[in-house]
Amino acid sequence: MSPAAQLAKAAARSTCMTRLPSGIRVATAPSNSHFAAVGVYVDAGPIYETSIDRGVSHFVSSLAFKSTHGATESQVLKTMAGLGGNLFCTATRESILYQGSVLHHDLPRTVQLLADTTLRPALTEEEIAERRATIAFEAEDLHSRPDAFIGEMMHAVAFGGRGLGNSIFCEPQRARNMTSDTIREYFATYLHPSRMVVAGTGVAHAELVDLVSKAFVPSSTRAPSSVTHSDIETAYVGGSHQLVIPKPPPTHPNYEQTLTHVQVAFPVPPFTHPDMFPVSTLQVLMGGGGAFSAGGPGKGMYSRLYTNVLNRYRWMESCAAFQHAYSSTSLFGISASCVPSFNPHLCNVLAGEFVHMARNLSDEEVARAKNQLKSSLLMNLESQVITVEDIGRQVLAQNQRLEPLELVNNISAVTRDDLVRVAEALVAKPPTMVAVGEDLTKLTDIKETLAAFNASGEALQPVGSAGSFGRVTM
C-alpha cells in the first residue's frame, strides 16, 4: 500500500466526540498500539489570570497528582508508580493539561486518578507551602537563564502584560505570597467538567465515555466561570524592552561572557485562521537553528536563516524562526544570539531577513518547506502522547479536530503567492523586540532599522568574516 493510501486509510478513521450532561467533552481517535494515551485539557491557564491571582496557574500545575479527598499523597504516588509513572501536568497560556500513557488494562485507574487530581484535590497547607518554595526557586532559576526567560519577556511586551502577556511562571515574590484561598478559588472557578475535554487514543470511544461519565462528577454545585478566550483582551500592542544582566565579579572562577539574546516578532492570525498554513510554511522556510548542530549535519541546512545568516556570519551563535500560535492571535518572529561585540550589526541582519522574506521565493524552496512541514507533522503524530494532545487542544479550542489528511491537504494547497502575501502583511505591522544581555548599549532598534530598509530600498549589511559593513542594494 502506498504512503498516500495508508494516510487516506488512517484519516478515514475520524475522531469521535461526545458531550456529556455535565458539559465535559470526550474525544477519541483509534490506534493499534498496545498502550492507551489519555489526557484532560482544561480551559484555564495564565490567560485568565488577573493582578490578584497572577501566577496561580503555575501552582495548579505544580500541585497535580498530590493528595486528594480520597487518597494521601503517598497513596497517589504509589498508584502512579503502579501505572508506570508516565503522567504529567503542565500549564500553557490558554490551557492546563494533564495526560499520560498507560497499558490498556490500567485505563480505568488512570481516568479515576485524572478525575481526582483535577476535581477533588485536597490542597493541604503543607503541600502549598512546599510548592511556594519550589516555585520561587524555579522562577529564580529561570531568570538566571536568559535564553529561556526571553520568551516570557516577548509575550509580556507584545501583549501589554495581560491576557496572553501573562507569564506561565509565577514571579518569586508572588510565589512566596500566594495564598491557599487564591488557589482554591481558581480550582473552583475554572477546573469544572464543563470547561474540560478528555481525549484518548488507543481506547474504544464508548469505553472512555463510560469511564469519564463515572469519574468526572462535579464535587461542587457552584457554577463555573463562563468566561472564554474571546472575552479576554489579548490585543497586540508591540514595543521594545531590554534587560541588562549584571556582570559577575572579574574574579569569578567560572565566568564566561554572556551572549546577547534578541527576539523580534510580529502579530499573525490565530491558529484557527486559514493563514495558519502559509505562516507555518513560512516558519519552516526561514528555519534556522544554532551554529553548532548537536544532531549532526543536514538538518534544515537549506533554510533561509542557515544559508543567509548562520553560514555567512561567524559571530552569530544562533538564529531561528519561531511561531507562537493561539486561538485569538499569534506571533511570528526570529530569535537570535551573538557575542556582544557584534551588537551593532545584529538588528541589521534580522531586519534584512524580515524584509527579504517575500522576495525571490523559488518554487524549490517553497516545495521543500511544505514537504518538511508535512513530514514533521506526520512524524509527530506517530507518537500517541502527541496525538492525544493534538485532539485535546483542537477540541478545546474549536470543538472539532482537523484530521491529519485535512492538515496535509491544506499545507499542499499553500502557494508561493500565499507566502508573499502573509510575509508582506507581517512586516507591515509594528514589531516587538526584546533583548537580554550584559551590555546592550550598542544594540540598535529594530523598528528604526526596518524603517530605514523600507525608506531607502538599500541597507548596510555586515560582512561576516570581517565584521565590517558593505553597501548592498535590495
Curated annotation (Swiss-Prot):
Gene Ontology terms describing biological process: protein processing involved in protein targeting to mitochondrion
A GO cellular component entry from the record: mitochondrial inner membrane
A GO MF term: metal ion binding
Keyword Transit peptide belongs to the record: yes
Pfam families noted in UniProt: Peptidase_M16, Peptidase_M16_C
Record keywords, A-Z: Membrane, Mitochondrion, Mitochondrion inner membrane, Transit peptide
Cellular compartment(s): Mitochondrion inner membrane
Family: Belongs to the peptidase M16 family.
Known partners and oligomeric status: Heterodimer of mas2 (alpha) and mas1 (beta) subunits, forming the mitochondrial processing protease (MPP) in which mas2 is involved in substrate recognition and binding and mas1 is the catalytic subunit.
Function description: Substrate recognition and binding subunit of the essential mitochondrial processing protease (MPP), which cleaves the mitochondrial sequence off newly imported precursors proteins.
Protein name: Mitochondrial-processing peptidase subunit alpha
Organism of this sequence: Blastocladiella emersonii
